[in-house]
Amino acid sequence: MQCPSCQNTDSRVLESRAADGGRSVRRRRECLNCEFRFTTYERVETVPITVIKRNGNREIFSRSKLLHGLNRACEKTGLDTSRLESLVEELELRLQQRTGKEVSSTEIGEFVLRDLKQISEVAYIRFASVYRQFRGIDDFVSTLETLNADQEQNHLATVR
């Protein structure tokens, strides 16, 4: 492993432990040249997931791109970044477990919306407004009414 400080390739492992629920290994390393300490993560190499965009273009699934979009939707909502990282991790795991390695951006958006609805209504609305390309106030009102109706249904189901 190359040292990020001096680019030397000799290092020793100080500590190893499971991370991401056992899906990766976190290693604490020390460069043998400059004694700089750094952390690496090792995970199983997976078959890349291809995302089919709305316009028909295909691109490789980017967890960082999705996480960036979620961070934007969740700004100032008080949601912890680690919770969003977990959401992306869970989504990527679901996609990897599918038999086909192609997924539409629509499916990804719906997965994210379903999960966000459980975590934060504000983040759900903000993400939905971009993902569903809201054109005006009517789109917001319609989504809020649907969200409210879902809440009432869930409340009635728990009361019974």
Curated annotation (Swiss-Prot):
Zinc fingers (unnamed) by residue: 3-34
Chain coiled-coil ranges: none
GO MF annotation list: ATP binding; DNA binding; zinc ion binding
Cofactor: Zn(2+)
One Pfam match: Zn_ribbon_NrdR
Record's keyword terms, sorted: ATP-binding, DNA-binding, Metal-binding, Nucleotide-binding, Repressor, Transcription, Transcription regulation, Zinc, Zinc-finger
Start and end residues of each ATP-cone domain: 49-139
PROSITE patterns associated with the record: ATP_CONE (PS51161)
Cofactor note: Binds 1 zinc ion.
Keyword Iron among UniProt keywords: no
Gene Ontology biological-process annotations: negative regulation of DNA-templated transcription
DNA repair is among the record's keywords: no
Role noted for this protein: Negatively regulates transcription of bacterial ribonucleotide reductase nrd genes and operons by binding to NrdR-boxes.
Entry similarity comment: Belongs to the NrdR family.
Protein name: Transcriptional repressor NrdR
Gene source species: Synechococcus sp. (strain CC9605)
